[in-house]
Amino acid sequence: MEDPAGRRVDYGDRRFDEHDLAPTPLAQFQAWYSDAVEAGVVEPNAMTVATAGADGVSARTVLLKAVDGRGFVFYTNQRSRKALAIAHDPRVALLFTWHGTHRQVAVRGTAEEVPRAETEAYFASRPYGSRIGAWVSEQSRTTPSAAALHEREAQLRERWPDTGSPDDVPTPPHWGGYLVRALEVEFWQGRTSRLHDRLVLVAADGPARLDDPAPWRTERRQP
């Protein structure tokens, strides 16, 4: 492999100043997300989710499925390592990395389960194969082989055939959504000479709504 120490990327000199901030964290996130989509970033909704469980810290890539005034929503098997970690300690961190725009958004907050009705509505919107897959995988557990997973998939497809209905596969009782309520949202803009812009919105009194400007103060942090 190449020596990673020798790889350099010129981030350009696009500035991100305090006067460039949108009125709320939600509006700013939506603006940058739209820029990432327009720049052709692959899966701009991909985010790293970091947790701290009884067995230590861990991180993985998960897809954002909703963002609104409440916070950021993702779905997962609730017996997975990440879900067990959240049950142990609800404090989490999210990181969106958009290489095509030389930007990052880092979020610190707390995770909680979304209402069951919200989980079931989202599950029904998923493609048939994804709904079956949620039943097939006992996420984070070992399996004797890939063939064992495919055999279970075939059994479940026979049990719940694809009828074209969103109700043909029930929502697993161990599968659900998590809402991350933000305490801090950092907007990072890459610039030349490592003098990047880092504007951080901080909610001093606990998790706050992303669509309300009142609870948030702005800090500029050194890169």
UniProtKB/Swiss-Prot annotation:
Molecular functions (GO terms): FMN binding; pyridoxamine phosphate oxidase activity
Residues the record lists as binding substrate: R8, V9, D10, Y11, K65, Y122, R126, S130, R194, L195, H196
EC number: 1.4.3.5
One Pfam family cited in the UniProt record for this chain: PNP_phzG_C
InterPro entries, sorted: Pyridox_Oxase (IPR000659), Pyridox_Oxase_CS (IPR019740), Pyridox_Oxase_N (IPR011576), Pyridoxamine_oxidase_dimer_C (IPR019576), Split_barrel_FMN-bd (IPR012349)
Pathway: Cofactor metabolism; pyridoxal 5'-phosphate salvage; pyridoxal 5'-phosphate from pyridoxamine 5'-phosphate: step 1/1; Cofactor metabolism; pyridoxal 5'-phosphate salvage; pyridoxal 5'-phosphate from pyridoxine 5'-phosphate: step 1/1
Cofactor(s) the record lists: FMN
Chain ranges passing through the membrane: none
Disulphide connectivity of cysteines: none
Cofactor remark from the record: Binds 1 FMN per subunit.
Binding-site positions, FMN: 60-65, 75-76, 81-82, 104, 139-140, 188, 198
Domain of life assignment: Bacteria
Catalytic function, reaction form: pyridoxamine 5'-phosphate + O2 + H2O = pyridoxal 5'-phosphate + H2O2 + NH4(+); pyridoxine 5'-phosphate + O2 = pyridoxal 5'-phosphate + H2O2
Keywords carried by this UniProt record: Flavoprotein, FMN, Oxidoreductase, Pyridoxine biosynthesis
GO BP terms: pyridoxine biosynthetic process
SUPFAM superfamilies cross-referenced by the UniProt entry: FMN-binding split barrel
Function: Catalyzes the oxidation of either pyridoxine 5'-phosphate (PNP) or pyridoxamine 5'-phosphate (PMP) into pyridoxal 5'-phosphate (PLP).
Family: Belongs to the pyridoxamine 5'-phosphate oxidase family.
Assembly notes: Homodimer.
Protein name: Pyridoxine/pyridoxamine 5'-phosphate oxidase
Species in which this protein is naturally found: Kineococcus radiotolerans (strain ATCC BAA-149 / DSM 14245 / SRS30216)
Gene: pdxH
